[in-house]
Amino acid sequence: MKVTCVLVVLLLLLPYGDLLGNSVCDFGSCVHNGCYCEEHRPCCTPGSCSSWWPRCPGSMMDP
């Protein structure tokens, strides 16, 4: 029963990936931690984006 609960919790957290924001966006794509990037703009650096703050400096926050 304990193992089942742990597996369920892990499966629920899996889509959020890096809560610490260690992933970097590629141009024009979204990565598993929910970081959004526009196609022709610079993307985020490690630590600037996480599932809690999904927009990066130099991408969709720009005018």
From Swiss-Prot:
Signal peptide: 1-21
Subcellular location: Secreted
PTM comment: Contains 4 disulfide bonds.
Tissue specificity: Expressed by the venom duct.
Gene Ontology MF terms: toxin activity
Top-level taxon: Eukaryota
A GO cellular component entry from the record: extracellular region
Family of this protein: Belongs to the conotoxin O1 superfamily.
Entry domain remark: The cysteine framework is XII (C-C-C-C-CC-C-C).
Purpose of the protein: Probable neurotoxin.
Protein name from the UniProt record: Conotoxin Cal12.5
